[in-house]
Regions:
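Short active-site segment of divalent metal-dependent hydrolases/proteases
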Residues: 61, 112-113, 153, 189
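Extended active-site neighborhood of metal-dependent phosphoesterases/phosphodiesterases
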Residues: 12-21, 30-42, 74-78, 119-203
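Acidic/histidine-rich helix-loop elements
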Residues: 2-6, 12, 55-91, 115-125, ...
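Active-site glycine-centered loops adjacent to acidic/histidine catalytic or metal-binding residues
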Residues: 58, 109-110, 150-151
Length: 203
C-alpha cells in the first residue's frame, strides 16, 4: 500500500510525506527497490530464528548547535553546520552497527534536536533539516530502524511524517505524534511506548 500528503512551511514551500507498506516477503532474501528517479537500493530480510539488533538513544541531529532558536541567519547557519557534523557522526555510528551484522535498530527517542516549542515562530518545519540529516546515511537504505518518541520529537507532528510504524494504537497518543505501537521479530514481541503521554494507565 502507498500513501502521501503535503505540508507547508511558513514560506509556502511544500514537503511531501510518502509511506509504503509491503507484505509477503520471504525471510533471508534480497529485495531491490527504487524511489522516483533515484538509484536502485536493496535490503535483505532477516533470519527470524536468530537475529541481532542494536539499541541506540538520542541521535539528536542538530544538538551541537549552541544557538537558541531565533529567526536569524546566524541560527540557521549554526543549525546547518550542526546537522552536517551530527549527521556525519551518526553515519559513522551506523556503519559500525551494520558491520557487526545487525539486523535492525531500536531507537529510544530524540531523533532530532529542535522542538516545535523552541523553533523560530513555533514552526513545525524548522526540524526538517535535522530529519533530513538523520535519514541521510546510505546505511538506512537497507538497515531498518524502529523509532520511539522522545521529548524532542513529541510536540511536533513532523515526527510522524518521517516514520511508517506498524500496528499504531491510539493508546498513548499525545495528540501530535501518535500512540504506542508494536511489532514481532521471530518469536520476540517489541512494544514501543510513547512515554511522552504521561497517562500510564493508557499504556
Amino acid at each position: 500500500t502507498y500513501g502521501g500528503f503535503v505540508i507547508k512551511d511558513k514560506d509556502g514551500n511544500e514537503y511531501n510525506s510518502n509511506k509504503a507498506t509491503i507484505s509477503g516477503l520471504a525471510a533471508h532474501t534480497t529485495y531491490y527497490y527504487k524511489v522516483d528517479d533515484k538509484e536502485i537500493k536493496s535490503f535483505k530480510t532477516g533470519n527470524t530464528g536468530k537475529f541481532r539488533f542494536a539499541f541506540v538513544g538520542d541521535p539528536q541531529i542538530g544538538s551541537s548547535n549552541e544557538l537558541k532558536g531565533s529567526d536569524t541567519e546566524a541560527f540557521y547557519n549554526a543549525q546547518s553546520n550542526a546537522v552536517a557534523n551530527d549527521s556525519y557522526n551518526w553515519s559513522q555510528t551506523l556503519k559500525k552497527i551494520q558491520s557487526a551484522g545487525t539486523d535492525f535498530i531500536v531507537s529510544a527517542g530524540d531523533q532530532i534536536q529542535t522542538t516545535k516549542k523552541k523553533a523560530p515562530g513555533n514552526s513545525s518545519t524548522t526540524s526538517e533539516i535535522e530529519y533530513a540529516g538523520y535519514l541521510s546515511p546510505d546505511t538506512l537504505a537497507s538497515l531498518p530502524v524502529a523509532t520511539t518518541v522522545g521529548n524532542h520529537d513529541a510536540d511536533n507532528a513532523n515526527y510522524q511524517y518521517h516514520f511508517n510504524v506498524p500496528n499504531l494504537s491510539n493508546l498513548g497518543d499525545n495528540g501530535k505524534v501518535g500512540g504506542d505501537y508494536y511489532f514481532t521479530y521471530g518469536d520476540v514481541l517489541f512494544m514501543m511506548l510513547n512515554t511522552q503521554d504521561t497517562n500510564s494507565a493508557e499504556h
